Amino acid sequence: MKKNIILNLIGLRCPEPIMIIRKTIRDMKDNEKILILSDDPATKRDIPNFCYFMEHKLLKNEIKVKPYRYLLKKGL
C-alpha cells in the first residue's frame, strides 16, 4: 500500500530539514510521495540537490512565497 506523507519543517534551519527528509525517505517505499513545507531559504538549493544526488524525483516546487512547498517521489 502506498502512503503519501506531509512533512512540516517550518521553523527549522539548515541542516535539519535535509536530515529529517533523508530519514523520512529512508523509511518509504519506491514511488511513494512526500510533500515538504519549509520556510528555510536554503531548501531552495538543498532539496533539488538532495533529489539529484540521492536519485529521487522532484515533482513540483513552489518557492515564490513562504512556506515553500516541495513534492518529491522516492526513486526515479
Swiss-Prot record:
Residues annotated as signal peptide: none
Pathway participation: tRNA modification
Active site positions: 14
Subcellular location, record wording: Cytoplasm
Disulfide bonds: none
Family matches, as PANTHER family: SULFUR CARRIER PROTEIN TUSA (PTHR33279:SF2), SULFUR CARRIER PROTEIN YEDF-RELATED (PTHR33279)
Record's protein name: Sulfur carrier protein TusA
Organism placement in taxonomy: Bacteria, Pseudomonadati, Pseudomonadota, Gammaproteobacteria, Enterobacterales
Gene: tusA
